[in-house]
């Protein structure tokens, strides 16, 4: 019957899908220093990235192409066999992003927007992710169905659903560090907003237990966030005090940015001074740098919460044009009775 034919067709498609999965072996996680193919290594991005989907500071997506050309895309060695397995390698290693990443719809990451396969190893992100309406936003990867190891993020994150310090949604995440401010609607976490499958937390736990490194596990510092979707897990997505986090990242040789809270005072897109402050302390505006003078304008630093500083901030100089003429409040026949000419700031007019 036609129903039987349809059933056979669907069963055949499922078998073909299973065969395709067995045909490819991802060897990215066994990367060594001597491996050079299928690898992005020691790269830095400082530029702004803008995309609708899959926006990343280093790469947009890590996935296998649908079309495979056996002649050009594969290497053969040894005797011929009907049982063929293709080994694939997609590795991003020792890369740094400092550029802002903007994604409109889905998949924004400091290093990679979307990971279907491959590994991100020992990579850092310091670029903010500005994606108020997008799903899957992460400090390292927006959406990862694969492996992230020994990576770290310090940035501001904004998104809709699935917003995470390391991955918006992740699978295997080990040995990673997060110091972020994250804002989202649902599924928000300092390590991951969510996990890619119901057994991901088991997979994560097994990976941590099997690790021989003393720095196994994922750690973060935050006064407001939980580790994974608002919940912290000892040894897997665990909070530390700021001092403990500083000691750990120093021991691991991570960049100084992970141990500093900095106020950047900027005027006309030029940094006037970068002031390092103590985590959680108040900043006295009397210690702010002198504002650069701009003829015909008054100047002040933009307002910010300086009573409890827990993250880097950029404070912009705000310039307001001086009034060249001021008038009295008293009028005669609807006109001011007195005009004064000069250069007046708002605070000088009473």
Model-derived features: positions:
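Residues that cap or initiate secondary-structure elements
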Residues: 49, 101, 129, 271, ...
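Surface-exposed interfaces of beta-sheet-rich extracellular modules
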Residues: 38, 90, 212, 281-314
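Extracellular, surface-exposed repeat/solenoid domains
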Residues: 348-350
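Short, solvent-exposed loop/edge segments of extracellular or virion-exposed proteins
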Residues: 131, 182, 264-280, 329-344
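Non-catalytic surface loops within mature trypsin-like serine protease
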Residues: 222, 279, 321-323
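A generic structured-segment signal
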Residues: 106, 270-276, 282-290
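Conserved "repeat-terminator" motif of extracellular CCP/Sushi domains
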Residues: 252-266, 292, 304-330
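Surface-exposed loop/turn motifs in large extracellular/passenger domains
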Residues: 1-188, 192-260, 293-296
């Amino acid at each position: 019957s036609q129903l039987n034919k349809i059933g056979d067709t669907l069963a055949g498609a499922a078998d073909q899908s299973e065969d395709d999965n067995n045909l490819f072996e991802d060897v990215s996680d066994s990367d060594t220093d001597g491996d050079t193919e299928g690898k992005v290594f020691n790269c830095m991005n400082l530029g702004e990235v803008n995309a609708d989907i899959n926006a990343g500071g280093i790469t947009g997506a890590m996935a296998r192409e649908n079309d495979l050309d056996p002649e050009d895309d594969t290497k053969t060695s040894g005797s011929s066999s009907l049982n063929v397995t293709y080994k694939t390698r997609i590795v991003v290693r020792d890369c740094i992003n400092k550029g802002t990443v903007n994604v409109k719809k889905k998949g924004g990451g400091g290093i990679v927007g979307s990971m279907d396969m491959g590994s991100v190893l020992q990579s850092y992100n310091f670029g903010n992710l500005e994606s108020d309406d997008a799903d899957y936003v992460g400090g390292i990867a927006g959406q990862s169905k694969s492996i992230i190891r020994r990576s770290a993020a310090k940035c501001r994150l904004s998104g809709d659903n699935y917003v995470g310090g390391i991955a918006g949604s992740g699978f295997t995440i080990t040995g990673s560090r997060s110091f972020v401010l994250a804002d989202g609607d649902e599924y928000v976490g300092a390590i991951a907003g969510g996990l890619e499958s119901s057994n991901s937390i088991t997979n994560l736990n097994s990976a941590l237990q099997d690790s021989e490194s003393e720095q196994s596990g994922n750690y973060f510092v935050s006064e407001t966030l939980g580790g994974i979707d608002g919940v912290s897990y000892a040894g897997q997505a665990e909070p530390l005090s700021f001092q403990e986090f500083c000691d750990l990242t120093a021991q691991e040789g991570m960049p100084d940015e992970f141990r500093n809270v900095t106020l950047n005072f900027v005027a006309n897109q030029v940094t006037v001074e970068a002031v390092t402050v103590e985590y959680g302390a108040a900043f006295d505006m009397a210690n702010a740098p002198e504002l650069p003078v701009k003829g015909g304008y008054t100047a002040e630093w933009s307002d910010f919460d300086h009573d409890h500083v827990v993250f880097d901030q950029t404070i912009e100089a705000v310039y307001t044009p001086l009034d060249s003429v001021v008038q009295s409040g008293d009028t005669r026949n609807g006109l001011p009775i007195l005009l004064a000419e000069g250069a007046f700031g708002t605070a000088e007019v009473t």
